[in-house]
Every structure is written in structure tokens, then in C-alpha cells.
């Protein structure tokens, strides 16, 4: 019969503090990585470049955050003229070009990963919705548009572009 070694590699008095230090270190590192991500910059509506329809440039607007259409897959009508904000409920604004149109307004940072009290404008139907934006640990931007309360809404998920995108004109 072979003798067995019964001496633990790490004594019980050291084991728990060591585990706590390791967990704390990894948790802090993960949180720091999420906090280093910025909402500002370019976002596209789909991971697959062949399915992308638009890109939005998110930037600081004073003490708040806003975003404008930066690129459109189809920026022109069939007649070659630039697409306009033709569904806007305000007739005076219907001739604005979609390219460069501000569609995200008034977002205030609640913390490093959440922006609230904003609005998102949908030029496809001319409707404006209350909105929040959340930056996920995976690096996606989740925009929730809703009427009244957030429960009754829709969430869009945007990603950073993987290919170079040229600003529309």
C-alpha cells in the first residue's frame, strides 16, 4: 500500500483570504474594462456589414449626449436626390436631408453604462420616442425606445463597425 500525503497545499487559514483577494481583483478588472468603454463614437445597426442600413455618430452635446445619422446604405431616392425627412410631423422640417440628421437627443448619464431621459427620432415614420441607452459589457449599445413607460417599447442593439464607413453627404 502506498502512503498518501495528507498535507494540504494551502492551509485553511490562508485559503479564504486568498480566494477573496482573487475574486476582488478579477471583479475590479472586469468592471474597469466596462467603465473604460465609451458611448461616444460610431455605431451601426447590425453586426453583419451586408445587412447594415445606417450608422450613427454619438457625441457629447454640452452636458448631454446626442447622435446623428452618419451613413446610410441608401442615401438617395431613385431619382438621385438625397433622402429627406419626409415623414416629419412638422411640415417645415420635411425638406431636411436625412444625412446628418440628429436622431438621438437629450441623453443624460446615470452611470458609466446607462444614459436616460433621452429621445430617439425614427425618420421612417416621423415618430419620436422616450429612450434610454445602455452600454453592455460585451460592447454593444442597447437603445430602448418607448411611449409612456419602458415596459412598452422596443430595444435596438447597435455595434461598433468592423469596416471603415464613409460619412454621407
State where each predicted segment sits.
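Boundary at the C-terminal end of the N-terminal hydrophobic targeting segment
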Residues: 30-34
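Edge beta-strand at a domain terminus
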Residues: 147-169
Amino acid at each position: 500500500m502506498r502512503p498518501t500525503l495528507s498535507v494540504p497545499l494551502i492551509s485553511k487559514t490562508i485559503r479564504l483570504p486568498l480566494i477573496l483577494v482573487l475574486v476582488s481583483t478579477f471583479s475590479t478588472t472586469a468592471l474597469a474594462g466596462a467603465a473604460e468603454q465609451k458611448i461616444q463614437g460610431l455605431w451601426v445597426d447590425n453586426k453583419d456589414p451586408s445587412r447594415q442600413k445606417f450608422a450613427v455618430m454619438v457625441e457629447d452635446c454640452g452636458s448631454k449626449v446626442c447622435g446623428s445619422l452618419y451613413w446610410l446604405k441608401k442615401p438617395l431616392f431613385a431619382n438621385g436626390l438625397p433622402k429627406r425627412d419626409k415623414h416629419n410631423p412638422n411640415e417645415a422640417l420635411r425638406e431636411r436631408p436625412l444625412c446628418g440628421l440628429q436622431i438621438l437627443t437629450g441623453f443624460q448619464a446615470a452611470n458609466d453604462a446607462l444614459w436616460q431621459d433621452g429621445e430617439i427620432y425614427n425618420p421612417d415614420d416621423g415618430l419620436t420616442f422616450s429612450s434610454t441607452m445602455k452600454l453592455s459589457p460585451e460592447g454593444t449599445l442597447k437603445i430602448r425606445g418607448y411611449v409612456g413607460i419602458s415596459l412598452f417599447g422596443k430595444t435596438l442593439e447597435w455595434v461598433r463597425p468592423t469596416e471603415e464607413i464613409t460619412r454621407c453627404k
